[in-house]
């Protein structure tokens, strides 16, 4: 079941929280709405579910306008962050609840409900806990029950609002893998909200990055990671170093160092230069490739690489992060002096992207 969102806007009072959102979600895809708190991602999810109404725009499922359709008639399953299980019901009864309240003409008989719930319990690997109550379950088990309950009515679309946000890190990882496997088996269309970048990258087929009610970028996890479309996406996804520079003519200056640009840009003056830690080279000797001196402040071993916090010497005020692959040089220690450069620097004037530059040859 595909989802088509066309020019949707939403106000709360005089505050506009969604700005003319347009997005197509193909049938069978798992899509992450990723953004910081207050970005509008949960509001968009609730509009898809029918729990909120848009002020403008059209929402369609597989080409059929559902904008005025009540939530109960949309055949959408919804999983909340805090489970929303009925405390007085067993696991079995929680999962069966949606089936028991269907209109009489659509409601399965007791035997069919029992069979369906049994299948769902096995699917979420909780068959041995059918008679327990929510208070007797772990957080991960509760979330599996909530997911089984949402799937019981065979929804056309599954929506999840930060489904793993209340769980500890290890349980989150396990449930992410499990949900992805379940999606591969059932091929349902799914949209989930998260502010966890790792979660979005690991689980989703496509990632929709949202900020201040706007869609900043839509793409595969690899696309939004490697080719950020806007300055917001670049700064929001992962760790990035921001350096201050200045363009004079066709030269970029950082402290006492300067590099030639291919063309003299229209913009002259102050710019921001962005480099991700793993896009920087590190050397024990100054060279054309690594001309910028730094001193190591912190060393964090990460298995096959070292994460370094270094203080630029004479060319930038604040510490920056650098990734040093294991084996390139001797194990780093605090106080070591190195030289760094970069091969994929991105230049911005405000929110405008200027030409990329390699900090590999200092003029």
Swiss-Prot record:
Positions of ATP binding: 35-42
SMART domains registered for this protein in UniProt: AAA
Cellular component GO terms, alphabetical: ATP-binding cassette (ABC) transporter complex
UniProt keyword Metal-binding present: no
Localisation: Cell inner membrane
Membrane topology recorded in Swiss-Prot or TrEMBL: Peripheral membrane protein
Main location: membrane
SUPFAM superfamilies in UniProt: MOP-like (SSF50331), P-loop containing nucleoside triphosphate hydrolases (SSF52540)
UniProt catalytic activity: sulfate(out) + ATP + H2O = sulfate(in) + ADP + phosphate + H(+); thiosulfate(out) + ATP + H2O = thiosulfate(in) + ADP + phosphate + H(+)
InterPro entries, sorted: AAA+_ATPase, ABC_SmlMolc_Importer, ABC_transporter-like_ATP-bd, ABC_transporter-like_CS, Mo/tungstate-bd_C_term_dom, P-loop_NTPase, Sulph_transpt1
EC number(s) on file: 7.3.2.3
One of the GO biological process terms: sulfate transmembrane transport
Keyword field contains Cell membrane: yes
Pfam family membership, one: ABC_tran
Molecular-function GO terms, alphabetical: ABC-type sulfate transporter activity; ABC-type thiosulfate transporter activity; ATP binding; ATP hydrolysis activity
Keywords: ATP-binding, Cell inner membrane, Cell membrane, Membrane, Nucleotide-binding, Sulfate transport, Translocase, Transport
Residue ranges of every copy of the ABC transporter domain listed in the record: 3-237
Superkingdom as given in the UniProt entry: Bacteria
Family indicated by similarity: Belongs to the ABC transporter superfamily. Sulfate/tungstate importer (TC 3.A.1.6) family.
Subunit structure: The complex is composed of two ATP-binding proteins (CysA), two transmembrane proteins (CysT and CysW) and a solute-binding protein (CysP).
Functional summary from the UniProt entry: Part of the ABC transporter complex CysAWTP involved in sulfate/thiosulfate import. Responsible for energy coupling to the transport system.
Protein name: Sulfate/thiosulfate import ATP-binding protein CysA
Source organism of the structure: Yersinia pestis
Gene that encodes the chain: cysA
């Amino acid at each position: 079941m595909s989802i088509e969102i066309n020019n949707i806007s939403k106000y709360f009072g005089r505050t506009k929280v969604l700005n003319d959102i347009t997005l197509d979600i193909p049938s069978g895809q798992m899509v992450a709405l990723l953004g910081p708190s207050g970005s509008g991602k949960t509001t968009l999810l609730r509009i898809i579910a029918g729990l909120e109404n848009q002020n403008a725009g059209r929402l369609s499922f597989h080409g059929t306008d559902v904008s005025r359709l009540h939530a109960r008639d949309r055949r959408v399953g919804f999983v909340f962050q805090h489970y929303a299980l009925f405390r007085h019901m067993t696991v079995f009864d929680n999962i069966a609840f949606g089936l028991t309240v269907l209109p009489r003409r659509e409601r399965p008989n007791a035997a069919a409900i029992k069979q369906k719930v049994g299948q769902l319990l096995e699917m979420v690997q909780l068959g041995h806990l059918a008679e327990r109550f929510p208070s007797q379950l772990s957080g991960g088990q509760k979330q599996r029950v909530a997911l089984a309950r949402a799937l019981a009515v065979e929804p056309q679309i599954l929506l999840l609002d930060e489904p793993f946000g209340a769980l500890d890190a290890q349980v989150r990882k396990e449930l992410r893998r499990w949900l992805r496997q379940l999606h591969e088996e059932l091929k349902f269309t799914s949209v989930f909200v998260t502010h966890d970048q790792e979660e979005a990258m690991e689980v989703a087929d496509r990632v929709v990055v949202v900020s201040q009610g706007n869609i900043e970028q839509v793409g595969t996890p690899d696309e939004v990671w490697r080719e950020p479309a806007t300055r917001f996406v670049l700064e929001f996804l992962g760790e990035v170093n921001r350096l201050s520079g200045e363009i004079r003519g066709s030269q970029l200056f950082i402290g006492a160092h300067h590099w030639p640009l291919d063309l003299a840009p229209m913009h002259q003056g102050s710019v921001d230069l962005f480099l991700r830690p793993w896009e920087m080279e590190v050397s024990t000797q100054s060279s054309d490739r690594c001309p910028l001196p730094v001193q190591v402040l912190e060393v964090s071993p990460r298995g096959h690489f070292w994460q370094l916090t270094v203080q630029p010497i004479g060319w930038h005020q604040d510490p920056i992060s650098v990734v040093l692959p294991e084996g390139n040089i001797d194990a780093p220690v605090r106080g070591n002096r190195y030289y760094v450069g970069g091969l994929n620097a991105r230049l911005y004037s405000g929110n405008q992207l200027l030409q990329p530059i390699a900090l590999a040859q200092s003029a």
